[in-house]
UniProtKB/Swiss-Prot annotation:
Coiled coil: none annotated. One of its GO terms (molecular function) is 23S rRNA (adenine(1618)-N(6))-methyltransferase activity. GO terms for cellular component: cytoplasm. This is Ribosomal RNA large subunit methyltransferase F. It comes from Dechloromonas aromatica (strain RCB).
């Protein structure tokens, strides 16, 4: 876990329970004598998220409707800290902060977690985009409960399912960074199979096919969890569409959960003729994932960008700064025929 992650040492359940009486009701003592919750219980996971967002990030009244993704907060915070380090590589090892740093969140969701964390940690401003109008309405209600966010978090509907960047930006809009947690699965059946497997691993087998659907403990459905072609197809489409706005975002980034997708993504980046691409490894416990980042701006353009946009912005040096990024491996060779 990232060293600046507020949960890097684990959940402080005593402090979180003091923040939220609703969470306190779900906290149990394990056989090992430690505090925990039932992570297979969606209500408990939601209360944990609400308490974390209030205790660590000052977010009041966070909530999501039934059926929407309830993401693990530490993993989302790792993404934000990792891209902050990425920006620092272009800013003399200082993380640019404040609302002048503009971040485009593709698929902001009903939970709006990335803007909440990014604004609290670094003061960044966000444009959150989604195809789901109900999700955007819930995100707007979170802003309504936290009016101090209204000037720094904007929400926008993307009405065309296959469009990611296409038709999205308005005249003159530029962003220092784009972020995305792409749909992971290829189909609803794929979602169901993974959900069933998770429940089986928890010794909670769930319902058989044809009965009530077993649920992922983090919820979610529809555009949040699946698209045709899954994660690989979505990220490839993002890369293709980024070619049409190459200098309006300095660093494009996306989470990439499946390591075997990397050769296909490398091939797409090569085809797009990006100036530079990197992978940024991330790990939470036994879970291994990574970010893929790419830019169409050369070193000189990035230095000009820094001078024009960040020199007047507050920033701070990254403690014991060490780049955890690396170019996509040149020796990785994609299959001859890409099935997606």
């Amino acid at each position: 876990m990232h060293p600046r992650n507020k949960n890097a040492e684990g959940y402080d359940f005593a402090a979180l329970a003091a923040t939220s009486a609703a969470l306190a009701k779900h906290i149990k003592t394990t056989q090992a004598g430690t505090a925990s919750i039932d992570f297979a219980n969606p209500a408990a996971v939601k209360m944990l998220n609400r308490a974390i967002l209030m205790h660590h990030y000052g977010v009041k009244g966070w909530d999501i409707p039934a059926g929407y993704l309830c993401p693990p907060i530490p993993g989302r915070a790792d993404y934000i800290h990792s891209v902050a380090d990425l920006l620092a590589t272009c800013n003399k090892k200082n993380i640019p902060s404040g609302p002048g740093v503009r971040v485009l969140d593709i698929g902001v969701g009903a939970n709006m977690v990335y803007p909440l964390i990014g604004h609290a940690e670094y003061g960044w401003s966000f444009l959150g985009v989604d195809i789901d109008e109900a999700a955007l309405a819930n995100a707007q209600s979170i802003i309504g409960k936290n009016p101090e966010l209204a000037s720094d978090i904007e929400l926008r509907h993307q009405p065309v399912w296959d469009n990611i960047f296409t038709g999205l930006l308005r005249s003159g809009e530029v962003f220092d960074l784009s972020i995305c947690n792409p749909p992971f699965h290829n189909s609803p059946d794929d979602v169901h199979a993974v959900s069933q497997r998770k429940w089986n691993n928890l010794n909670k087998p769930g319902a058989k096919r044809g009965a009530a659907e077993p649920r992922l403990n983090f919820g979610g459905g529809g555009s949040e969890l699946w698209c045709n072609g899954g994660e690989r197809a979505f990220v490839k489409r993002m890369i293709e569409q980024s070619c049409n706005i190459p200098k309006r975002v300095m660093w494009f980034t996306s989470l990439l959960s499946q390591g075997d997708n990397l050769p296909h993504i490398e091939a797409a980046l090569k085809k797009a003729k990006v100036v530079e691409s990197r992978i940024i490894p991330m790990a939470q416990g036994q879970k291994q994932s990574r970010l893929v980042a790419w830019t169409f701006c050369g070193n000189g353009e990035r230095e000009k960008w820094r001078r024009e946009r960040w020199t007047a912005a507050p920033s701070y040096a990254v403690p014991a700064f060490a780049e955890q990024t690396a170019p996509l491996t040149a020796e990785a060779t994609p299959p001859a025929a890409d099935p997606v």
